[in-house]
Amino acid sequence: MSTADMGFVTAKLAALLALTTAERGSELTALTIQGLTFSGDYKVTLFPDPAFVPKTVSELSRRAPVVIRAFHPDPRTPEQRRRHLLCPVRAMRIYLRRTSVGRRSQQLLLTYGGRSPGSALSSQRLAHWLVDGITLAYTTMGEPAPRLKAHSTRGTATSIAVLAGVDWEEVRQAAVWRGDLTFMKHYYRYVNVRSVADAVLEQA
């Protein structure tokens, strides 16, 4: 990522954030670098723009901060080092270093290229990037991509968590759902965790 195309770097960070937080696109583009804090290589804490109004307005949906934990933060084996390429904390450090020059906004995710590089990224543009990322994961596995939209990352992330045995209440709170029906009706899908992870790692 240190020398990769900036479009790839931005899209990769956005995809990792979407998959590890289960946030909506609008919530991801509301994250800022103000108050952003790293706790070594183990986690990063971010805050949304105070003016941001989430889709689900409730005490739960206004939670802050957003805490993102590292993936294999201290890799020892070749396999651990390979999986560490998917670490969102690592990706965040590289992204912030590469956007430190030319940054025009306090928003975390920025545009690149075009007429105004370094400006705040819109949720619409982010949606396109997320769909491209999911499509790439499917095609890398040699499978046809289903009908996709940016919201698919939200369903994928929460489905992986449920299938991996994460406590349902923790999943529900992360996604800001009031009950089980929302997840089962709109988001649940069977996910082969190892296949998806391996497909993305090959592109890292």
Regions found by a protein language model. Name each.
Residues 1-204:
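Extended, non-catalytic subsegments within catalytic or DNA/protein-binding/adaptor domains
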